[in-house]
A protein has these predicted regions:
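Glycine-rich beta-alpha loop elements in corrinoid/cobalamin-binding modules
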Residues: 2, 29-165, 379, 385
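Radical SAM enzyme core and accessory elements
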Residues: 2-5, 15, 31, 36, ...
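N-terminal [4Fe-4S]-dependent radical SAM core
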Residues: 11, 142, 148-200
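Glycine- and acidic-residue-enriched helix-capping/strand-helix junction motifs
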Residues: 12-23
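Flexible glycine/acidic-rich beta-alpha junction loops that bind and position SAM and/or redox cofactors
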Residues: 12-13, 99-103, 150, 209, ...
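Catalytic cores of alpha/beta
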Residues: 105-108, 354-369
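Glycine-enriched alpha-helix->loop->beta-strand junction motifs that scaffold or abut catalytic
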Residues: 112-114, 298-304, 371-373
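Radical SAM [4Fe-4S] cluster-binding motif and immediate context
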Residues: 172-347, 357, 365
């Protein structure tokens, strides 16, 4: 069967475009099953999906099914894409983070153009559905699948499948991506072309930690790691066969088991696969690190590590964020990473429930103390499926009109708490203050950045992002909205004079 696998365009500030790795896994699984997948990533396409649907019809080889993935802010775009595909007679299937949290919503009568919904990791079950449709057999309910019955009622299997043996999955179908249209992952090293051949790799799925702000519905709470042999084989393929210029490890927590992480580093070194720079895109868990691990990572080609610091107040970290780490462990991780010669990046969150001016000031002070090469200060967004969302629903109110309001870069999903303490306007002021004090009010940092080639090659996008970041986007009434998050790959590093004009 000819199948389109599609991803709506995430409307973020960042000009960087990264490969949607999940579609690569689905495509490889379908192809191994004898089907013919085509990947449509709206983020890098110049034409709408119907262009390819019509082109295939004209060639006499029409597509029969479309599978669309969507996070919460993009579910509206996914519905629109499904409606378009249905008008051409395609079977429509939805999956991804939002569908895992709210699977039945997309099968309501107003979405009669959606045929099937999957939750959880759907590589195997999606293939089984396509096989069934190809053979003309009646569709039976599969694990994690939701569909309509004969009378139009929604029938559901509420399990959320997790693939135990990740080695059983084929490597992502990178040959189906238009690699030249994607950008490098981060401003990683001087001299790396912006449109370098950048690939991501997933060495594990799942995370056992219970951070209240984190939504991890698809991969779940159970951590499952690929074997070191399997990871090294894919790494070798990326370096030697696909000629990667950089690699990004995108696990939620790839270093959960330090012995495995160290073994992987030793193998990369021993097999000469340490010549391509790489980074930990989603960061590392500080309480699963030591100096030896960072030294091995450096020798294995790693250039930068990120850490989820989140907050500088011990009470907030322990009782609200529930990160499962201490400030002492945070400080040790930064110290050891720097001692190993790695660049560091810190992720900080402003605006969790119970946040006060004092706790936010503690976060700013900690960021200045740790002094990472890059700092990303984020505004908390109460995504459905998170403990934070439940906390606010129980003790406050969320001001969001529709799912697009949950776009983390727009900050339209503001909320208030009934405790009389939380102040969303104060949160935004302190968040902006954090960026000013970290990036603008320390001349030595400005001069350090200006001395690097990457500063000047990134200048156009930095200016554009800075203006949009500090001025915000205008809503339909012409008012400036507050942006909720700077993209991790686009930290504000411009000179003080440029940003002062934007403030």
């Amino acid at each position: 069967m000819r199948v389109i696998l599609a991803s709506p365009e995430a409307k973020v500030w960042s000009e960087r475009k990264h490969i949607p790795l999940g579609l690569g896994y689905l495509a490889a699984t379908l192809r191994d099953g004898g089907h013919e997948p085509f990947i449509y990533d709206a983020a890098i396409e110049d034409v709408p999906v119907e262009f390819y649907i019509e082109e295939a019809e004209q060639q006499g080889k029409p597509y029969e099914l479309i599978g669309i993935t969507a996070a919460t802010p993009l579910i509206g775009d996914a519905w629109q894409m499904a409606q378009t595909a249905k008008s051409y007679g395609l079977t429509t299937v939805l999956g991804g983070p939002h569908l895992t949290i709210m699977p039945r919503e997309s099968l309501e009568p107003r979405h009669d153009y959606v045929d099937y919904v999957f939750k959880g990791e759907a590589e195997h079950t999606f293939l089984e559905l396509v096989d069934t449709l190809q053979a003309g057999r009646p569709v039976q309910l599969l694990p994690g699948m939701h569909m309509r019955g004969r009378d139009g009622e929604i029938i559901s299997d509420y399990s959320s499948p997790m693939i135990e043996n990740l080695d059983s999955l084929p490597f992502p179908a990178h040959d189906l991506f238009k690699i030249d249209r994607y950008t490098n992952l981060q401003p990683l090293t001087d001299g790396l072309d912006r449109h370098a051949r950048s690939f991501t790799i997933l060495t594990s799925r799942g995370c056992p930690y219970k951070c209240t702000f984190c939504s991890k519905p698809v991969t779940g709470d159970t951590w499952r790691g690929r074997s070191v042999d399997n990871v090294v084989a894919e790494w070798r393929w990326l370096v030697q066969d696909l000629h990667a210029s950089e690699i990004g490890v995108t696990d939620d927590i790839w270093n959960l088991k330090m012995d495995r992480a160290k073994e992987l580093m030793r193998r990369l070194i021993a097999e000469g696969l340490n010549t391509v720079p790489w980074t930990t895109v989603h960061g590392m868990k500080v309480n699963h690190t030591d100096l030896e691990l960072f030294q091995l990572m450096k020798a294995a080609g790693c250039k930068r590590v990120g850490f989820g610091v989140e907050n500088g107040d011990p009470w907030m970290l322990r009782n609200v964020i529930r990160k499962g780490q201490t400030l002492e462990q945070v400080r040790d991780a930064f110290k050891n990473a720097k001692a190993a010669g790695l660049q560091t990046m810190g992720f900080f969150i402003f605006g969790m429930p119970n946040e006060t001016e004092e706790t936010m000031e503690a976060t700013i002070q900690l960021a200045l103390e740790l002094d990472p090469d890059l700092a990303n200060f984020m505004l908390a967004a109460p995504f459905p499926g998170t403990k934070m969302y439940d906390m606010i629903r129980e003790g406050g109110e969320i001001f969001a009109n529709d799912w697009p309001d949950y776009a983390i870069h727009e900050q339209r999903s503001r909320f208030t708490m009934n405790d009389g303490i939380y102040n969303s306007d104060l949160v935004v002021r302190k968040w902006r203050d954090a960026y000013r004090r970290f990036y603008l009010y320390r001349p030595e940092r400005v001069w350090e950045k200006m001395s690097k080639k990457s500063f000047w090659t990134e200048m156009p996008s930095t200016i554009s992002n800075a203006r949009r970041f500090f001025l915000g986007n205008k809503d339909q009434n012409g008012h400036h909205g507050h942006n909720g998050r700077v993209n991790p790959e686009e930290p504000v590093t411009s000179v003080k004079g440029i940003l002062d004009r934007a403030l």
